[in-house]
Amino acid sequence: MMHIIFTGVECTFKSSLAQAVGSALARKVCPEFAREYLDHFYPTPSMDKFPREQFDAIAKGQIRAQKTYGYYNDGQCIFDTDGLTLEIWGADKFGARDIQWLTPGAPSFYLLCAPTNSYTSDEYRIDGHRREELHLKFVELLDALGRPYVILHEPIFENRLFEALRIIKELGI
């Protein structure tokens, strides 16, 4: 039994894929905490000058959500991101790092969403012009940590969903 973790840069279908795969496989889905937090507590964002305190609150909430959904226990949950995103976001924007963000959970497999799809901006996305650069940071971090992963390349959502489901089936996860 393994958890499946969707990870990658902004606007690569992670949340939609997590929900669709969870539905297709009848598995619980742990949503990304940041979007929920921002919608509730920071409804008129200025992401260019995003406060460190807000990031810290998001990081704590994400780790708490992971614990709630059994990230550190054996299981077959779907996670719409994990601490890798906190590590890259925190280091990039604040020079922040926390060992807790990279503490491995139970056996998991990462589906890294490549920025091959069209970019859709919204009030929370500010790094659209840096997607390739940030994608490489995910690849480097996954490699450095020795975490198992496959990159999802399909540029259209439906095709990426089929790609993810095919990989999950082939790997038996």
PLM regions and their residue ranges:
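Conserved lysine of the Walker
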Residues: 14
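Conserved nucleotide-sensing/catalytic segment adjacent to the nucleotide-binding pocket
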Residues: 44-96
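A glycine- and Lys/Arg-enriched "phosphate-lid" helix/loop adjacent to the NTP-binding pocket
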Residues: 94-161, 172
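Hydrophobic anchor at the beta1->P-loop junction of P-loop NTPases
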Residues: 6
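Active-site flanking residues adjacent to catalytic metal/cofactor-binding acidic residues
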Residues: 31, 79-81, 113
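Pre-Walker A (Motif I) flank of P-loop NTPase domains
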Residues: 1-3
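The conserved Walker
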Residues: 10
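Conserved substrate/cofactor phosphate-moiety recognition/catalytic segment
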Residues: 19, 23-63
